[in-house]
């Protein structure tokens, strides 16, 4: 039986690791593109379903619960728009890891009580470009 040199083992292991890294990178790009396409489809549906707010007739306290719209089995509370980086995405009513693969999610709080926290992946099509924002850039959340 022939002895395998340590150098050959290192070369083969290096090639395998490079292929694995390339595959992981390709999968991440696919997931990013898929999430972006799905979010844009939902945003178009949301914009058609957005209710026109009725003028308030009572001077009572505002209900902090955000109204939801259901699309394809997921509930959405609004839309986030960041024109400086070309972001216009739906926001899901509750967060979970599987939901984050579709669109940004409300982690907690409400826009009506000024404590809304939105979480999203760092996909290029989601919040991946936030680092390029500058002070004064507009960020708008529109609820249902």
Q: Where are the regions a protein language model picked out?
A:
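Solvent-exposed, non-transmembrane regions of membrane-associated and secreted proteins
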Residues: 4-144
């Amino acid at each position: 039986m022939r002895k395998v040199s340590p150098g050959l083992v290192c070369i083969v292991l290096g090639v395998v690791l490079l292929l694995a890294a390339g595959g992981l990178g390709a999968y991440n790009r696919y997931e990013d593109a898929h999430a972006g396409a799905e979010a844009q489809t939902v945003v178009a549906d949301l914009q058609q379903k957005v209710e026109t707010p009725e003028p308030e007739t009572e001077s009572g306290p505002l209900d902090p619960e955000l109204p939801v719209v259901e699309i394809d089995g997921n509930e959405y509370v609004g839309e986030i728009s960041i024109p400086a980086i070309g972001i216009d995405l739906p926001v899901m009513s509750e967060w979970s890891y599987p939901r984050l693969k579709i669109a940004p999610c409300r982690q907690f709080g409400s826009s009506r009580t000024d404590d809304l926290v939105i979480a999203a992946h760092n996909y290029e099509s989601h919040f991946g470009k936030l680092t390029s924002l500058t002070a004064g850039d507009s960020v708008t959340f529109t609820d249902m």
